[in-house]
């Protein structure tokens, strides 16, 4: 189903698919569910809700689809690179800022055995906050990496996905939007091969593809491959997609996503 109202901020915004909004919400809830069970895991491959991390890949696919659908046909008329980046900044960065500020506050008041935020200097927390506000990754082992577990954004761990979201948007605006559908298909295939090779070789060291949240080892490479494949696949889908009406589509898709993400490791 489509919502025919447009955003007040952008008068030329296209109608959006409410179904995709709903599925994004379902995937977000599944990520929370995944991380709750992660706290009870005995190993990287025993996380109860084992493939919940793939919801991030679903987000990347959705982002690619929405960006392609919303902007592909505007570049020859009203859209330029500056305008595109302005729109995406307005769409994405409020979440970065809000998450960083809330993360800093909760870090300063927490006092659990695992991470006692009261034992970290305020100056380092403020430095971590500043880096997070500008989406600059913290260097593992540095003072600004206040949790000490190698995260790019220790005050708000999920910001790593927005870091790659920005990379996807930059690649789209500067290069990928100019690709023909055939060239885009080739890119998707090559990215899929790269991601599959990463998985088969277990470069993550975890036995799965839950990577991208750290600068350590091959983590950054894995995150980039996840982004490149999923975001490009979403862009390709936006070009070849033909809308059809399916009764109960939201529930069918929601159940399918939940089942796929809960499949145990073999």
Language-model features, listed with the residues they occupy:
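Short, Lys/Arg-rich, polar N-terminal cytosolic tail immediately upstream
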Residues: 1-19
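Membrane-water interface at transmembrane helix exits
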Residues: 37, 68-72, 103-107, 176, ...
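Alpha-helical transmembrane segments and their helix-entry boundary regions
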Residues: 20, 83-84, 92, 161, ...
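Membrane-interface helix termini and inter-helical loops of multi-pass transporters
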Residues: 42-47, 112-118, 206-216
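Transmembrane alpha-helical segments and their boundary/interface "anchor" motifs
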Residues: 53-56, 73-113, 118-135, 168-169, ...
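Alpha-helical transmembrane segments of integral membrane proteins, especially early/N-terminal helices
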Residues: 13-26, 122-123, 187-191
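Aromatic-enriched alpha-helical transmembrane segments of multi-pass intramembrane proteins
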Residues: 124-266
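Functionally critical transmembrane alpha-helices in membrane proteins and complexes, commonly lining
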Residues: 15-74, 90-100
């Amino acid at each position: 189903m489509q919502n025919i109202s447009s955003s007040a901020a952008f008068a030329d915004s296209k109608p959006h698919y409410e179904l995709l909004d709903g599925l994004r919400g379902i995937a977000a809830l599944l990520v929370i569910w995944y991380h709750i069970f992660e706290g009870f895991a005995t190993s990287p491959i025993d996380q109860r809700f084992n493939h919940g991390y793939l919801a991030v890949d679903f987000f990347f696919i959705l982002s690619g689809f929405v960006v392609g659908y919303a902007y592909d046909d505007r570049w020859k008329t009203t859209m330029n690179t500056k305008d595109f980046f302005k729109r995406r900044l307005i769409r994405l960065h409020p979440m970065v800022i809000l998450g960083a500020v809330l993360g800093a506050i909760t870090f300063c008041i927490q006092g659990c055995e695992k991470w006692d935020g009261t034992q970290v200097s305020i100056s380092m927390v403020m430095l971590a906050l500043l880096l997070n506000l500008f989406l600059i990754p913290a260097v593992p082992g540095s003072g600004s990496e206040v949790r000490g577990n190698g995260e790019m954004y220790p005050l708000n761990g999920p910001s790593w996905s927005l870091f790659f979201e920005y990379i996807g948007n930059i690649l789209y605006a500067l290069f990928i939007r100019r690709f023909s559908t055939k060239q885009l298909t080739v890119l998707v295939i090559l990215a899929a091969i790269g991601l599959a090779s990463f998985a088969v070789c277990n470069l993550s060291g975890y036995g799965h593809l839950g990577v991208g949240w750290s600068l350590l080892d091959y983590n950054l490479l894995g995150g980039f491959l996840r982004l490149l494949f999923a975001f490009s696949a979403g862009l390709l889908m936006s070009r070849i997609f033909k809308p059809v009406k399916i009764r109960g589509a939201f529930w069918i898709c929601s159940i399918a996503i939940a089942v796929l993400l809960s499949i145990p490791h073999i």
